[in-house]
Amino acid sequence: MEVMNLIEQPIKVTEWQQTYTYDSGIHSGVNTCVPSVSSKGIMDEDDACGRQYTLKKTTTYTQGVPQNQGDLEYQMSTTARAKRVREAMCPGVSGEDSSLLLATQVEGQTTNLQRLAEPSQLLKSAIVHLINYQDDAELATRALPELTKLLNDEDPVVVTKAAMIVNQLSKKEASRRALMGSPQLVAAVVRTMQNTSDLDTARCTTSILHNLSHHREGLLAIFKSGGIPALVRMLSSPVESVLFYAITTLHNLLLYQEGAKMAVRLADGLQKMVPLLNKNNPKFLAITTDCLQLLAYGNQESKLIILANGGPQGLVQIMRNYSYEKLLWTTSRVLKVLSVCPSNKPAIVEAGGMQALGKHLTSNSPRLVQNCLWTLRNLSDVATKQEGLESVLKILVNQLSVDDVNVLTCATGTLSNLTCNNSKNKTLVTQNSGVEALIHAILRAGDKDDITEPAVCALRHLTSRHPEAEMAQNSVRLNYGIPAIVKLLNQPNQWPLVKATIGLIRNLALCPANHAPLQEAAVIPRLVQLLVKAHQDAQRHVAAGTQQPYTDGVRMEEIVEGCTGALHILARDPMNRMEIFRLNTIPLFVQLLYSSVENIQRVAAGVLCELAQDKEAADAIDAEGASAPLMELLHSRNEGTATYAAAVLFRISEDKNPDYRKRVSVELTNSLFKHDPAAWEAAQSMIPINEPYADDMDATYRPMYSSDVPLDPLDMHMDLDGDYPMDTYSDGLRPPYPTADHMLA
């Protein structure tokens, strides 16, 4: 019987081992318990699965197993044949010769004879390995039909013993390849694993599939035999070793077997895997989290299943409580994939994900730091109200000093979002030299818009609406940032960067000390040039009756509004006011009063209000026929617009005849100041009652990466988290950047 030959095989191997000094690897089991193909990168090489889950050595006795005379004769002939081959090819492999050679060895020394004998011994060892390999394969192949029959036996004891034998065979390479070549046996193993209630049988069968999964042929055999649903079922086992074998085998299938991901999803594998995040074995968790990443990447439904089963909370808990680098890295990969899902993002943030990820920004592992940075970048647009981010903000400011492009991209983008509409964060970043660090990042970035644009947006946030805003405005000047910032207005820079730069210049102009440096940098001609170009483009679409298109996500009307608003603030300085007037801008400003966009009407009336302080400019405004649209704007629902219009009308009526002035006065009183006497004083002094720029958020940007591009890392869906009104001067949120998921490594 072939099974008897398998039982006697260890005896024969022992005899062979006594005849030479090199271990064949069969008797000792060296390198037979191989970790998962993928887990070789996840688990330490010196701590393979055998040390984590110890398999019991099972000795199968021959009692009760019938053995006829033919079997004995076959066994004797096989043994004699192998012995004759060895004696013919390697006569020195006998036990006596080997012992004589060993007897000549002196501890700690190698004789010349031994050195001369080494090549011969190596050759003998290789030949013995070959003989062992061939015998294992031949013996296993002959035993396969009988083992398959025993696995299908109705007696559970017989099935268990058969599973133990197959498990031992699966640990040897030659016999393992024979097993993979038998679809009937693999199917029997899968069936046994799925139907058994015996823990030892479950352990042996999962171990068999685990060993087969280290070869592509084995993966295919498992897949074709319906092994995936059975392995998913084993994820509910109470036995740790069974869990390990099942998750590792599934991991190898997910990595290398086509169709495995869909099969795992259909078998409800995610629903079984997410609860495993509560286990406390770091290496087991590392494989589990990598399975989640492979399943979630590029599949929105999988991301939602992970969310529904409490995945974000479990993943954040791992990032918070563990220090094993490979586990932290694989977990950060999953969070990175989930961080572009609009549903998962708030859940991760609410679970404390920002703080947990921030803990690892100072790690010695570059790949972990990079994953944490990207994930923080992706989550930051929904974390603007989060507390406890002080240490994260400080680390991000420090990260601005590095030269790595990815680090700078993530750090600037995250700072841009976390300083959006958050006065506390703005103040903290400003007080920790954030302005200086951002300026230096811009200077080093060159033409890399992925760094420059978020850095400019962050500076725009820091220079407005918080207690240290004036300090930030001055800091830009003191760190020689104004010339570099003004240069960003030049084409062919991308429109999002130009738009952000215009808003920053507007904020810098709020500080009187910045007016002279801005003028020296020739900011006014550049703003006027951009204004004219953007207005012409917008008018062409109006004339053609087409909707205003977006250029790189920016409408030309936004550029018109931004440039006019910046010129409005700059016009508070007499020298700037004169330069703006000499550039023949008044006809354009008057034309903008007819715009259908309320914000454009407001900033146009505002800049005319400043220019009208000079008599020559006031006369030019009147000559352009501004009175009619200004009278209409007195009835505007926007108080700022109405106030500016009243101030301009009041100024240009000063030199008119008494009848005209009386008519203007009556109109002002009836339309604007009937219930607000203070507004009349404001109009007379041309001081706006309210800050004209609302604290609206910019529309969000593109996601960092998308699940629909090649793997390592992320999801390329447009990640819009709100339809916010566009305002050039407002704080703007930045969603994740698009990036291929293969960057996840």
Curated annotation (Swiss-Prot):
Common junctional plaque protein. The membrane-associated plaques are architectural elements in an important strategic position to influence the arrangement and function of both the cytoskeleton and the cells within the tissue. The presence of plakoglobin in both the desmosomes and in the intermediate junctions suggests that it plays a central role in the structure and function of submembranous plaques. Acts as a substrate for VE-PTP and is required by it to stimulate VE-cadherin function in endothelial cells. The keyword Lipid metabolism does not apply. Residues 574-661 are annotated as: Interaction with DSC1. Gene3D superfamilies: Leucine-rich Repeat Variant. It is found in: Cell junction, Adherens junction; Cell junction, Desmosome; Cytoplasm, Cytoskeleton; Cell membrane. The modification Phosphoserine is found at residues 99, 125, 182, 665, 730. Residues 132-297 are annotated as: Interaction with DSC1 and DSG1. This is Junction plakoglobin. May be phosphorylated by FER. It is a peripheral membrane protein. ARM repeats lie at residues 132-171, 172-215, 216-255, 258-297, 298-341, 342-381, 383-420, 423-464, 470-510, 512-551, 574-613, 615-661.
